[in-house]
Amino acid sequence: MIFDQKGIRKRSITVAYFYNTISQKCCDLKLRRVNNVDEQKRRIYERDLHRPGLALAGFTNLFTYKRVQIFGNTETRFLNHLDDEKERNRLFENFVRFKIPCIILTSNNKLPESLIEMATRAEIPVYSTRCSSTKAIYNITDFLDDQFSIYQQYHGSMVDVYGVGVLLVGKSGLGKSEVALDLIERGHGLVADDAVVIRRKGESTTLMARRNNIIDHFMEIRGLGVVDMKANFGIRAIREQKEVQVVAELMHWDSDTEYERLGLDAKSTKILGVELPLVQLPILPGKNITVIIEVVALNFLLKRYSNYVAAEALHSRISQVINSERTNFDGDE
């Protein structure tokens, strides 16, 4: 199966969205507003952050002003310890003339009220956090990495089977949702059905799957209708997100197609440029796809943690028997 490799990436987010969302998702950060400005007017265009040491000192030739500006102990103490108030105001005025998204003061640091007023006049939001610069940078970078990551929505079902993220794909009507439902009934977890949103952060080779926020954890079963999986099976049956580790493609049985029987020739596919193992499963009456998906997950775990592949073990055993019999035959002659 060929997947669309062209992901979608956000060009920017508003500072208002940044503040509201990160406040909900990252409780440790606990950002607080220092001034009141229209946060909708400011936008963040980059996932990287900036410590503006040289820019505060007046060197702005290479100033990456489109990034969120982090004021740690060094920056705040530099400004607070300038004896000449006029010089301090001049340097900060030179700083805020750029269209900066926002300023974040870490470690509960404070700026003189005159500098906060300058930022307010320039319509630059200023926030404060009790977190250290290291912790704040880690949390904010992780959040922005997620916001500016490449993503794409695919048709299929995403399930967590024995801790392995399995993406079920295939043409409509093959029973992907029914297989996912059966897996949930057997104690596994549903991540998404019908519309699976897959993200790739930066240059990472990890793909994270989530549900479509509109469809949520609703599932359509042909002949039955829409089922609320969370309401029916409880919180244990759903997962907020899961790494995509194996792709299982359900296919119509075709007598002219040669399907893999031994597993020596491992297939793979690519999603957003990341290579993933692919298992193609032909659909036949009486075939228990649910149990096969469980075995697919167990085989993945065996290979990852024990480097054990059943087909290779069987091939090695047969080769040893053949070589042994050949040696005995040559000895008899």
Swiss-Prot record:
Enzyme nomenclature, EC number: 2.7.11.-, 2.7.4.-
Region Important for the catalytic mechanism of dephosphorylation, residue ranges: 282-287
Statement: the UniProt record of this protein carries the keyword Magnesium: yes
Cofactor: Mg(2+)
Membership in a protein family: Belongs to the HPrK/P family.
Notes on the domains: The Walker A ATP-binding motif also binds Pi and PPi.
UniProt name for this protein: HPr kinase/phosphorylase
Source organism of this protein record: Chlorobium chlorochromatii (strain CaD3)
Gene that this sequence comes from: hprK
